[in-house]
Structures are given as C-alpha cells and as structure tokens.
C-alpha cells in the first residue's frame, strides 16, 4: 500500500513542477557568427524566467555569465534552455567565450 501512494505522490509532484515551469516567461536568444541577437534582453525583476538559447552558427558557441553563475555550450543547430531565479533590478553581463570580441550582451532586470 505504501509503494503505490509514494508513486502517486511523486507523479503529482512532477506534474505540478512541469505546470509551474510552463507558466514561466520565456525569452529567446539567438547566437550566430559570434554575436547575440538581441544583444540586450529586458526581463522583469523579481520574476523567475527561462532563457531559450539557439546556436544558428557554423561552430560551437557559449553563453556564459560570471555574475549570474550560468554557462552553456551549444553545438551548431542546438537549442537549450536556462532557468534564472528572480533577479534584483540591475544589468547583468553575458558573453561568448569562443568569440570574446563580438559575443557580448546584457540582461536588464527592471
């Protein structure tokens, strides 16, 4: 009897966490030819959000932010997502370590 109840509880927990994640605002970032499009992303401060990152370039790229402690390497043609916890108002830098001269951007939380 305990095992079926535990399985049910785990199933409900997973279903509710998926529903919560689907309600999260999603912002899109395109990486191509060593650049970010857009270079600046405006997000609401104090709100958890998802950043969907897509590499449309011919080589590997990297989304990295030391301030936000996030790093993501993408092969050509790959799309991946990062979830950010609520941010304080401010401006947070990100960059592409493989293209340091051109791959610069910023997330503005307002």
Each model region followed by its residue ranges:
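Bacterial N-terminal signal peptides that target proteins for export
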Residues: 1-7
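Bacterial N-terminal signal peptides
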Residues: 7-16
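Sec/Tat signal peptide C-region and signal peptidase I cleavage site
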Residues: 17-21
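Extracellular/periplasmic metallocenter environments
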Residues: 22-28, 74-110
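N-terminal edge beta-strand
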Residues: 23-46
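N-terminal post-signal-peptidase region of extra-cytosolic proteins
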Residues: 32-39, 65-68, 77-81
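Beta-strand cores of secreted/periplasmic/IMS beta-sandwich domains, seen most often
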Residues: 39-59, 79-87, 93, 109
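Histidine- and aromatic-enriched segments that form or immediately flank copper-ligand environments
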Residues: 56-76, 104-106
């Amino acid at each position: 009897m305990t095992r079926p109840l535990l399985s049910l509880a785990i199933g409900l927990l997973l279903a509710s966490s998926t529903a919560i994640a689907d309600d999260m605002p999603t912002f899109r970032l395109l990486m191509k030819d060593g650049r970010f499009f857009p270079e600046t992303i405006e997000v609401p401060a104090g709100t958890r959000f998802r950043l969907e990152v897509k590499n449309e370039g011919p080589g590997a790229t990297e989304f990295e932010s030391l301030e936000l402690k996030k790093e993501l390497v993408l092969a050509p043609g790959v799309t991946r997502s990062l979830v950010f916890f609520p941010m304080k108002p401010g401006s947070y830098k990100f960059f592409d370590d493989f293209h340091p001269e051109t791959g610069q951007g910023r997330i503005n939380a307002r």
